[in-house]
C-alpha cells in the first residue's frame, strides 16, 4: 500500500512539475536602431518566442492567447547589450489602449504592456524586470527572494520605443550590461520569461513560459535562455555630481550669493557587493511625494527613492513586504520634531 501511495505521489509531482521552454539568443553583427520598428533584416533571422498562455487571472491559467492577439518576441545581443524586439498583434490597431504617465508607475495604467524578466544567475530566486507600455512608458524592477520582494526603485539605464503598425504594435528595447549583473563565464545560461498585459481582455496577463501561481512562484517559472557567449560584465561605475548657485538681490541692499556642490558615487565591487558613497547629498533629482492628509496618530511612510538608500533595500523587508519593513530609511535626513507624528 505504501509503495502504491509513493508511486501515485511521484506521478502527481512529475505531472505538476514546471514546464520550461528554451530560446537561443542571436548575436547581432550590427545593433538595431531602437525606434520600435522591426525593420532590420537581422530580426527576421531570429526564432520567435511565441505560444503565450494565460498567467493571470490564475483561475483560468493555461488558456492560449487569442489568435487576434498573437504575440512574438525576439532576443539578440552583442558585446554591449541585450536587444529585445516584439510584435504584439491587436484586432483594432487604431484603438490600442494608451495612457501616458510617469516612469515606472505609468505602465500600470490603462495601457497594454510587455515585459521581460531575466534571472541572470538562473537561481530561480532573483530577477531583473524591464517593461514598456503601448504608450511608450518604461519601468524597471528588481525581484528577490522567497517573499516575492519587488522594487520599482531599481531605476537603471535602459531604453525602449514602440510603434503602432497594421497588425497591432511593436517594440524594441536595449538593456545595457551595466543594467544587470551576471556571472563571468564564457557561456551564459539565464532564466527568462516574457509577458503581456491586454487591457481589452480584462487586463489579463499572458506569459511565454507557463506560470501557474497556484503551484509555483513567478521566480520558479522562468524559461531558459542559451547561446549568449563571450560577454564580460562591464565596469559598474556611476557618478552623479551636482552644482547649484543662488543669487539674492534686493533694491537698496547688497546682493548676496551662495553655492553648493556634491557627488554621489556607485561602484560595483563585484556581482555581490556595491559601494555607495555620497558627499554633501542633495537628492534634488528625486521625485516629490504625493501630498497626503494624515489624520491618524501614526507616522506616514513614503517610498524611498534616494539612490543611496535603495541599494540592498530588500535586506530590510519583512516576510510580507506589504506589512512594513525592519528599517525605514526615510527618517534619515529629517529634522527632529517630537511634536510630529
Predicted regions and their residues:
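Hydrophobic h-region of N-terminal signal peptides that target proteins for export
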Residues: 5-17
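Structural preference for beta-rich elements and adjacent junctions enriched in aromatics
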Residues: 17-341
Amino acid at each position: 500500500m505504501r509503495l502504491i501511495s509513493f508511486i501515485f505521489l511521484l506521478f502527481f509531482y512529475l505531472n505538476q512539475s514546471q514546464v520550461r521552454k528554451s530560446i537561443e539568443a542571436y548575436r547581432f553583427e550590427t545593433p538595431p536602431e531602437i525606434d520600435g520598428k522591426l525593420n532590420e533584416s537581422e530580426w527576421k533571422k531570429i526564432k520567435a518566442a511565441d505560444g503565450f498562455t494565460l498567467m493571470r487571472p490564475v483561475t483560468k491559467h493555461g488558456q492560449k492567447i487569442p489568435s487576434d492577439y498573437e504575440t512574438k518576441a525576439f532576443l539578440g545581443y552583442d558585446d554591449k547589450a541585450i536587444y529585445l524586439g516584439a510584435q504584439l498583434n491587436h484586432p483594432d490597431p487604431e484603438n490600442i489602449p494608451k495612457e501616458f504617465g510617469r516612469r515606472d508607475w505609468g505602465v500600470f495604467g490603462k495601457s497594454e504592456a510587455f515585459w521581460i524578466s531575466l534571472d541572470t544567475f538562473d537561481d530561480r530566486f532573483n530577477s531583473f524586470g524591464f517593461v514598456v507600455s503601448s504608450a511608450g512608458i518604461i519601468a524597471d524592477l528588481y525581484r528577490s527572494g522567497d517573499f516575492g520582494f519587488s522594487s520599482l526603485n531599481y531605476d537603471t539605464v535602459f531604453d525602449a520605443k514602440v510603434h503602432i503598425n497594421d497588425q497591432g504594435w511593436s517594440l524594441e528595447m536595449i538593456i545595457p550590461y551595466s543594467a544587470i549583473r551576471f556571472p563571468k563565464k564564457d557561456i551564459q545560461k539565464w532564466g527568462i520569461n516574457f509577458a503581456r498585459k491586454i487591457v481589452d481582455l480584462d487586463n489579463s496577463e499572458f506569459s511565454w513560459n507557463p506560470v501557474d501561481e497556484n503551484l509555483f512562484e513567478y521566480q520558479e517559472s522562468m524559461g531558459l535562455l542559451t547561446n549568449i557567449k563571450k560577454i564580460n560584465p562591464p565596469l559598474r561605475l556611476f557618478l552623479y555630481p551636482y552644482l547649484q548657485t543662488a543669487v539674492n538681490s534686493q533694491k537698496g541692499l547688497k546682493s548676496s550669493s551662495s553655492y553648493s556642490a556634491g557627488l554621489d558615487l556607485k561602484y560595483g565591487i563585484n556581482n555581490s557587493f556595491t559601494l555607495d558613497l555620497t558627499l554633501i547629498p542633495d537628492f534634488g533629482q528625486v521625485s516629490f511625494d504625493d501630498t497626503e492628509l494624515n489624520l491618524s496618530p501614526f507616522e506616514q511612510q513614503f517610498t524611498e527613492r534616494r539612490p543611496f538608500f535603495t541599494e540592498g533595500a530588500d535586506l530590510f523587508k519583512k516576510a510580507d513586504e506589504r506589512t512594513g519593513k525592519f528599517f525605514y530609511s526615510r527618517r534619515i535626513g529629517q529634522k527632529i520634531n517630537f511634536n510630529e507624528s
